[in-house]
């Protein structure tokens, strides 16, 4: 805690400043002595709320409770920061406008600042520049649940404390001047506030509401309040647009520029006057605010509320107890822990009612205590949620249910909901990752059936945005992370087809990797690389980062990324170049997991070195000492520090695993709570200096519950079941510990595994899935002979020699007898192509590849058209764009065709380069095939009556599906992507085939 005592208060004249300084010193002694006398653990005394209040940290020093709806904190005049962010309070300032009841911690964007009030002496002023005040940090004090400052301009001593939904202010006015309470309700941090309303209910109660834009001015929300004074007032009034209206009881603001406010004036006292205000807020209504006030602040004892807040914070912070290290390092640690316990925030009233995202009034679901709001999704899924699953499991389950309620009310899971306003700030689908992490941690106290439905809905909606015109690499990588998380959950919940499809989507980050440059790069809609790429350039297709930073953002598949970059040695070399070349940004989210990636490359000692170095350098006990000056983003950067100092971090948000680094303290204990089985998990680090200096920071050996731990990771259950992790540290790295390939943390690639299924193409060739889209040509032998069980989503059918056909079997059994539907996107990239066919074979056909000649119809033979047992439907451009139904003849390698001329009259041109066509082929289960193609909003549809031989072919219960294409000329390319296969009325589905209709 930082205690600021006015150095010049000891003067012969007993001024207000002297009294303030004396009271400040006495309060310090009074609060600290009992704790020391009793020997109780008092982590509140190790929290400095001023850490992070400058250099862009954007934290607030005011009074709040853990996850409280109210954050009663000072606001300074609105001003932009050099980095484009903004904050309500900056430690470098010396002028405060007043206080407001709502804030977010560390978001770097104008937000909240609702229900603003202040105090003055003398004449009533209605402009912020006039009613604000100068102050000195020597006369300012902050600790969890309490804030105090001496208002030099007015000679007023101000103190603040808070409950969950309410706050109390205590003003000690000097004698000899009128005392004023001002409520400039239109004053909000977003600058935009209307409509607003104020009403004097009686001579000690003011009520009203303020409507303000929420988070980066994206949406609006309304906050209702009730303000009461312990001293009835006789002189009061309102103002609008600077004009005062004495004794007016009600006022509305309907236009942005007509700002309103209320004032209360007390006569000049002959001695110091103490005025207390208690303020309750609600997002439901004025009645809700009044009930919150009645439930939480029934009396007027400021000290009782302050002590209650301190007790609440001591309980919350005592969930982690550390030993060792300097006092400064302990202050940094507990302040970081404090910051992780601020958001998300409680959003329901004391009676259990809350306003939903649909703007309707709802009740907290049965079995849950609270509804939470303010999910900084893009940030918190990385570190905040993994930490909270350990420390606050019951709250986290309520948070998960709150996300589910958002889906029920809006039909979507938004990535950055604030208050009751659904928001889409940033990119990706981060709250899916949050829900999965919570579930995988064993916290099942929320409606997963509805949650999964919402996450699946999100996944389908987001996947349609791939390869968009803005070529946003960051967005695609972020989506891959959530796809991987949901894939693992789908497998757990026994949705194998969806799990397979999502796992495939999760690996699409590889399609953004350009082996020529060694970086993830944006692509154009036609698949070509966007020109002018510079990996060090900030922005431009990378959200808040560079190509260097986003090279590493594949936490779901780090082992796949290792292979993509050429193996462990090449991966580690490039990662080292990333750090040594000053490309790493420890102040922001995109690459905060990067130091832990050495654990995947057989060099955990380098993870230990980098983490310790960055923690010491960027986290200090100064106002600018949070993440090197970055936004805390609702506890995300603070959570990184807390986890890293405990000795582990969650790289992959979709699993319940933690990657290891060296602990920062000699002993740390996590006190666990239900529903976890364990009572405590202890981290004991031996031979650690504990002084925050370079030295004994390298893991030499480790024991987990008495058993040797030789790998640089463990599961979350190892913690939540309780136990002891003992780590022996040394001054020199042990390059063997955790270095074996088998010891690397699991990734999507390693979980999916590799199977014996092979893609088949022209006689004599097999190929595996390469790092990019699958290319079928005459050079496939260069690829390895084993491929993943899950097919790639995009296939490139390319010929390097004139007149060669290519084909690929998807090697999945499908149900033919029932209705089915296959669909895909078809793109001709350059030149002309002979066409393509969707090929279906019954189970007796086999998959023997036969030689073919030119033409995509002959490609059916190359693709394995077996006599009597095969059917192909597709487009033959070689004869002038015919829709053909081809099937095997009774004998030999010839075909029968049912051509349907398309010619130049068809609305869809299959021979037009770089114009995507969506193709759908469906079977009604009887005698009809339906072929449909859509291009640029125009659609071609044809129903084909099957002859009896084909009807019998499809009567076979099971079969195989494949694709064949003929390019017919040098360097002609077709791209097939977005595969879908769905069966109707099916009682048996393929084990691993993508089935969105499941």
Question: What function would you assign to each model-found segment?
Answer:
Residues 1-12:
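N-terminal secretory signal peptides that target proteins for export/translocation
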Residues 19-28:
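Bacterial N-terminal signal peptides
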Residues 30-36:
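Signal peptide processing junction and immediate N-terminal pro/mature segment
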Residues 36-385, 389-433, 439-477, 490-496, ...:
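Accessory carbohydrate-recognition regions in carbohydrate-active enzymes
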Residues 46, 96, 146, 155, ...:
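Extracellular structured ligand-interaction cores
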Residues 161-163, 174, 267, 686-688, ...:
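Short beta-strand micro-motifs enriched in acidic
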Residues 759-994:
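Polar, low-complexity loop segments and adjacent catalytic/binding residues used for recognizing
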């Amino acid at each position: 805690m930082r205690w600021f005592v006015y150095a010049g208060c000891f003067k012969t004249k007993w001024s207000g400043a002297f009294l303030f300084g004396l009271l400040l010193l006495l309060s310090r002694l009074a609060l600290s002595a009992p704790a020391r006398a009793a020997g109780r653990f008092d982590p509140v005394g190790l929290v400095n709320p001023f850490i992070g209040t400058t250099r862009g940290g954007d934290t607030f020093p005011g009074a709040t409770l853990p996850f409280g709806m109210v954050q009663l904190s000072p606001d300074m005049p609105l001003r932009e920061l050099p980095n484009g962010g903004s904050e309500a309070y900056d430690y470098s300032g010396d002028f405060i406008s007043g206080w407001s009841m709502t804030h977010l911690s560390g978001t770097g964007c104008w937000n909240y600042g609702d229900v603003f009030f202040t105090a003055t002496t003398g004449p009533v002023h209605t402009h912020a520049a006039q009613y604000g005040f100068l102050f000195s940090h020597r006369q300012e004090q902050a600790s969890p649940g309490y804030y105090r400052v001496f208002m030099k301009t007015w000679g007023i001593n101000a103190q603040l404390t808070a409950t969950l939904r309410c706050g109390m202010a205590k003003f000690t006015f000097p004698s000899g001047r009128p005392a004023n309470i001002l409520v400039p309700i239109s004053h909000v941090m977003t600058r935009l506030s209307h409509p607003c309303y104020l009403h004097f209910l009686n001579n000690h109660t003011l009520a009203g509401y303020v409507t303000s834009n929420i988070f980066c001015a994206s949406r609006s929300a309304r906050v209702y309040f009730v303000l009461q004074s312990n001293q009835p007032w006789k002189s009061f009034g309102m103002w609008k647009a600077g004009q005062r209206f004495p004794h007016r009881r009600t006022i509305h603001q309907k236009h942005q520029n007509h700002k309103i406010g209320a004032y209360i004036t007390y006569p000049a006292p002959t001695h110091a006057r103490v005025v207390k205000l208690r303020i309750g807020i609600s997002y439901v209504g004025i009645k809700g605010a009044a009930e919150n006030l009645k439930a939480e602040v029934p009396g007027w004892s400021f000290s009782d509320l302050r002590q209650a807040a301190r007790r609440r914070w001591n309980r919350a912070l005592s969930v982690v107890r550390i030993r060792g290290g300097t006092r400064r390092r302990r202050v940094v640690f507990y302040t970081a822990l404090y910051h992780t316990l601020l958001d998300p925030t409680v959003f329901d009233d004391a009676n259990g009612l809350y306003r939903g995202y649909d703007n309707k009034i709802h009740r907290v679901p049965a079995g849950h205590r609270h509804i939470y709001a303010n999910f900084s999704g893009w940030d918190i899924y990385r570190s905040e949620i993994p930490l909270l699953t350990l420390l606050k499991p019951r709250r986290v389950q309520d948070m998960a249910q709150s996300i589910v309620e958002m889906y029920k009310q809006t039909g979507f899971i938004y990535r950055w909901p604030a208050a009751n306003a659904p928001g889409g700030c940033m990119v990706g689908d981060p709250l899916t990752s949050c829900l999965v992490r919570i579930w995988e941690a064993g916290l099942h106290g929320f409606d997963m059936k509805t949650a999964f439905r919402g996450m699946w809905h999100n996944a389908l909606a987001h996947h349609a945005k791939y390869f968009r015109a803005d070529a946003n690499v960051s967005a695609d990588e972020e989506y891959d992370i959530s796809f991987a998380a949901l894939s693992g959950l789908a497998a757990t919940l026994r949705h194998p087809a969806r799990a397979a499809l999502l796992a495939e989507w999760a690996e699409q980050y590889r399609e953004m990797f350009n082996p020529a440059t060694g970086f993830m790069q944006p692509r154009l809609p036609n698949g070509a690389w966007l020109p002018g790429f510079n990996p060090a350039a900030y922005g431009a297709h990378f959200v808040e980062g560079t190509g260097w930073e986003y090279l590493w953002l594949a936490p779901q598949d780090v082992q796949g990324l290792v292979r993509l970059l050429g193996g462990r040695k090449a991966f580690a070399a490039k990662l080292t170049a990333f750090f040594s070349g000053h490309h790493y940004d420890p102040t922001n989210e995109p690459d905060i997991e990067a130091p832990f990636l050495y654990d995947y490359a057989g060099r955990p000692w380098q993870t230990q070195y980098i983490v310790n170095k960055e923690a010491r350098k960027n986290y200090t006990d100064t106002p600018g000492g949070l993440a090197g000056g970055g936004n805390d983003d609702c506890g995300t950067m603070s959570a990184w520090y807390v986890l890293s100092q405990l000795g582990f971090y969650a790289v992959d948000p979709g699993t319940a695993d933690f990657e290891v680094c060296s602990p920062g303290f000699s002993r740390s204990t996590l006190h666990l709570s239900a529903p976890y089985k364990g009572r405590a998990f202890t981290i004991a680090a031996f031979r650690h200096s504990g002084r925050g200096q370079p030295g004994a920071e390298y893991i030499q050996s480790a024991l987990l519950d008495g058993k040797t731990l030789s790998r640089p990771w463990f599961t979350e259950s190892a913690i939540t079941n309780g136990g002891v992790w003992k780590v022996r540290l040394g001054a020199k790295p042990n390059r063997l510990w955790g270095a074996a390939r088998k010891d690397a943390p699991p990734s999507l690639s390693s979980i999916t595994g590799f199977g014996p299924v092979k893609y088949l193409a022209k006689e004599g060739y097999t190929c595996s899935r390469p790092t990019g889209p699958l290319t079928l040509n005459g050079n496939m032998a260069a690829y390895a002979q084993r491929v993943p069980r899950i097919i790639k989503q995009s296939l490139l059918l390319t010929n390097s020699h004139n007149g060669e056909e290519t084909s690929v079997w998807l090697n999945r059994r499908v149900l033919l007898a029932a209705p089915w539907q296959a669909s895909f996107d078809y793109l001709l990239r350059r030149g002309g192509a002979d066409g393509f066919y969707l090929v279906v074979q019954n189970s007796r056909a086999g998959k023997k590849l036969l030689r073919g000649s030119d033409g995509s119809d002959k490609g059916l033979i190359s693709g394995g058209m077996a006599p009597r047992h095969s059917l192909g439907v597709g487009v033959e451009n070689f004869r002038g764009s015919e829709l053909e139904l081809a099937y095997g003849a009774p004998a030999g390698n010839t075909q029968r065709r049912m051509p349907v001329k398309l010619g130049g009259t068809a609305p869809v041109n299959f021979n037009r380069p770089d114009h995507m066509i969506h193709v759908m082929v469906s079977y009604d289960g009887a005698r009809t095939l339906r072929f449909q193609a859509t291009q640029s909003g125009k659609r071609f549809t044809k129903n084909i009556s099957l002859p009896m031989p084909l009807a019998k072919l499809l009567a076979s219960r099971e079969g195989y599906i494949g694709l064949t294409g003929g390019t017919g000329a040098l360097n002609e390319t077709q791209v097939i992507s977005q595969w879908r296969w769905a069966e109707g009325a099916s009682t048996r589905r393929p084990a691993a085939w993508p089935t969105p209709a499941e």
